[in-house]
Amino acid sequence: MSNLANSPEGEAFPYIAQNVGTLLDTLAETAKAAGVPVPRLIPVTKSAAPDEFLALMRAYPEAAAENRVQAWKERCELLETAGLPAPEWHLIGSLQVNKVKYVVGKVALIQSADSEKLIREIDRIAVARGVRQDILIEINSGREPDKGGVLPENAESLATFARTLSGVRLSGLMTMGPVLPDPDAYRPYFALTRELFDRFAAAGLFETDSPILSMGMSDSYLPAVREGATMVRVGRALFRHEN
């Protein structure tokens, strides 16, 4: 049960807990209608003010994701100051090689691994620290030059490379897709990523019994669920306040 109602943030932002509940219900209903498992919700907190973030963590303390390493550090400090437990942290934004040392072994999942250079550095630091770092390979399903992610035709070789390393655990795939006005227009990009996911799973490239297919954000999580996402990354929809 959420302890948001007994907190200062709960009084100021009651709609956040309501949004979480509504979204979880929508995910369950959409998955049931599509005949697929209910995906896991990973809240993205980059757009939240500090008090909004704390309200969300009281309402849904299970997991959270940040785009930038510095923002993640600040969120961790905020939780410590507030006396709240850390969620399962995911890093979903572009990760610079020189920032890898700050997150390996400290975040549960790096969702944006997209090059041999980056994965090799994650592995190097993980081995030095005696840990295995879970990663997802990010797929640039829209073939957008200004976005991160490996092109679909290069994804299998990158996955095969990751499987040779002892310090990383390849746990699945992630994609964003291009920004589109119609949610259903995302479906071809999600379907493409799902096809790669299914093929890699059949080939034994994922080192987990429950591989992750992370697709869908605030404007696209419904088509992502219908295309079989096992995880959705939602931010803005959790903080909307409609009078």
Model region roles, listed by residue range:
Residues 229-243:
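Gly/Pro- and small hydrophobic-enriched strand-loop and loop-to-helix capping segments
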Residues 2-219, 227, 239:
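Conserved alpha/beta-domain cores
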